[in-house]
Regions:
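Canonical Rossmann dinucleotide-binding motif of NAD(H)/NADP(H)-dependent dehydrogenases/reductases
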Residues: 1-11
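NAD(P)H-binding glycine-rich loop region in Rossmannoid oxidoreductase-like domains
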Residues: 32, 36-76
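Glycine-rich NAD(P)-binding loop of the Rossmann-fold in SDR/ketoreductase-type enzymes
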Residues: 40, 68, 72-83, 122, ...
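Catalytic helix-loop patch of NAD(P)-dependent Rossmann-fold dehydrogenases
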Residues: 75, 110-148
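Conserved Rossmann-fold NAD(P)-dependent oxidoreductase catalytic core, especially the SDR/UDP-sugar
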Residues: 79-125
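Glycine/proline-rich active-site loop of Rossmann-fold NAD(P)-dependent oxidoreductases
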Residues: 133, 156-167, 188-200
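Substrate-positioning beta->alpha
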Residues: 148-150, 167-190, 198
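Mid/C-terminal beta-alpha module of Rossmann-like enzyme folds, strongest
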Residues: 185-246, 251-252, 263-265, 271-275
Length: 277
């Protein structure tokens, strides 16, 4: 979606990802160049940043895989970020680096007064958040124009099996963000000079601010699953979901176009379509 958005506005795009990835719909398309490589390998990173005007850094080892091997996670998420910064400082010093971080870096804020603001201290609850905090520090120190985006959990309106245990408590504050709104935020961060040098929360906004129980109840009602079957994260286990201050990010990027209600409507339509097939 991000590539399509860039191309739709007339920008040429270079996609850099692992050789094992599926590049269908990208390779051979006008205005799209595919570079296969690994961010832990400096030579291919140097090749990837040649002649670019902006970099969207999305590459990372994500949970749950990131929790299995700390060294591998830090090698990819932190050392990979170092390689991108060094390559840009050497070959693309005028290009903007937009770094995709996470609201999980705030740690457990359940006992605090919402919303969580970007000035809030960061406390890693897992290796992934640890890697993002370390990478943010590197990005802030880079001799480049940079943007830090701390992104909330992403909601995609497609039919998925509920997880065995939802990763939040029933009472926990929860604010996610629609996938297409994330794409809009990412794209606009690349082309909006006013956001350079800033750290911004990217989340759904007031219509998405709900509780863990209500979020699950809404989904189970659409899926036709009895709410008695739900299992939430234990009360004694720390978690990072909350409500977020997105006033500045919305003012600068104008990305919150899909309300929570519209997301539920799209999900319901998807379920009805699948049942009709």
């Amino acid at each position: 979606s991000l590539v399509a958005r860039c191309r739709g506005d007339g920008h040429s795009v270079r996609v850099f990802d692992l050789p094992v990835c599926d590049f269908a719909g990208l390779e051979g398309e006008p205005g799209i160049e595919v570079v296969q490589g690994d961010i832990t390998q400096m030579a291919t990173v140097m090749q990837a940043v040649q002649g670019i005007s902006a970099v969207m850094h999305l590459a990372a080892l994500l949970p749950p895989a990131s929790g299995r091997n700390r060294e591998r996670t830090l090698a990819i998420n932190v050392d990979g970020t170092i390689n991108i910064i060094r390559a840009m400082e050497a070959n693309a010093r005028e290009a903007v680096l937009v770094f995709s971080s996470s609201v999980s870096t705030y740690g457990d804020t359940t006992l605090e007064t919402p919303p969580v603001r970007v000035e809030h201290h960061q406390t890693a609850l897992d290796i992934y958040a640890e890697s993002k905090i370390a990478s943010e520090r590197l990005v802030r120190q880079a001799q480049l124009p940079t943007v830090l985006l701390r992104i909330a959990g992403i909601a995609v309106p497609v039919l998925q099996d509920p997880p065995p245990v939802w990763p939040f408590t029933a009472e926990q504050r929860l604010e996610m963000v629609h996938r297409e709104d994330v794409v809009t935020a990412l794209y606009k961060a690349l082309i909006t000079p006013a956001v350079q040098g800033k750290t911004l929360n990217i989340a759904g906004g007031p219509t998405w601010q709900t509780s863990g129980h209500q979020y699950v109840a809404d989904h189970y009602e659409i899926l036709g699953v009895p709410l008695e079957m739900v299992a939430f994260r234990g009360q004694d286990e720390p978690g990072w979901d909350d409500w977020y201050d997105t006033i500045e990010s919305q003012r600068l990027l104008d990305y919150q176009h899909h309300s929570y209600a519209s997301y539920l409507e799209a999900l319901r339509a998807e379920v009805e379509r699948m049942l009709a097939d």
